[in-house]
């Protein structure tokens, strides 16, 4: 039987002659803080994602060896879904809640030191502490965009290239660790994870005593204002509340005055009776006249055609109306226009000119 030759191209086929003495298989990567990652992994690691972006804890930190000391490399990290499910926290355990959301465009975080010689990456562990996770799909700050309640794992890419523009044609290797799998959440679901974060995260020192943020509480106590200052601050509020009470009492007095002095409508004008109750009210959009705010209601609603004639006598003309005006007024009495209304001052029949007092009922 004939054996087919291996048609797979060797890894160094795309490499330049200077890369041949150092095959890529010699690169090794180990995860730093493995013990801490294992503590979280045994319970079920959770990572907070926010709109503005949140750093990871434990942070992604790796130790690299086997690089070419004088060759330049780029260190990249991306996050891929572990499965196609969405999860929920129910009765102290994670359960499948349904199908995963459509995968978002994959973003890759580039270490800020990239590109750098291999000697630079190998002299100390490579930390991706500035990497942030977000759930903002419109993020423009380069954060990693993830769905909440989904499981992800980070992948570490080591690319031999002089710059980002030549990454596509460069040789690279990908490394991942099962201990770094996590569930993205907007708030911690497992109380044990919360406790582990507080006990091990150096930025959570304020929460370590009885699970409270003692740093914030101490700061609040140190900035507590003195009683004198507190009284001074309350004075304006007391004044404002007193002013509101006086205004409220004033409004009540106005209402009482309106009710205590109802407008008497002459029996000779029966078509006003249906409008009597609404004559005291003004539309909500228009402010009440100044005369109504200052004292009892002195206005009532009357048909518009008599407005000009009535105002004419209010101006001080004490002469008797011409006969044609009286005839026009008598003609108006025979018509009813309840919707065509305006406001004029109310006067007693004793104060009216002689031409009005002699009108027939």
From Swiss-Prot:
Compartments where located: Nucleus
GO cellular component, one term: nucleus
Full protein name: T-box-containing protein TBX6L
Free-text function comment from the UniProt entry: May be involved in regulating somitogenesis.
Low complexity: compositionally biased ranges: 280-290
Record-linked Gene3D superfamilies: Transcription factor, T-box (2.60.40.820)
Compositional bias ranges of the Basic and acidic residues kind: 206-220, 234-259
Annotated InterPro entries: p53-like_TF_DNA-bd_sf, T-box_DNA-bd, T-box_sf, TF_T-box, TF_T-box_CS
Region annotated Disordered, chain positions: 203-259, 280-323
Keywords: Developmental protein, DNA-binding, Nucleus, Transcription, Transcription regulation
Domain of life: Eukaryota
Residues of the DNA-binding region: 36-209
Pfam short name (any one): T-box
GO function terms (MF aspect): DNA-binding transcription factor activity, RNA polymerase II-specific; RNA polymerase II cis-regulatory region sequence-specific DNA binding
GO biological process: cell fate specification; positive regulation of DNA-templated transcription; regulation of transcription by RNA polymerase II
Induction: By FGF-4, activin and retinoic acid.
Location (main, coarse): nucleus
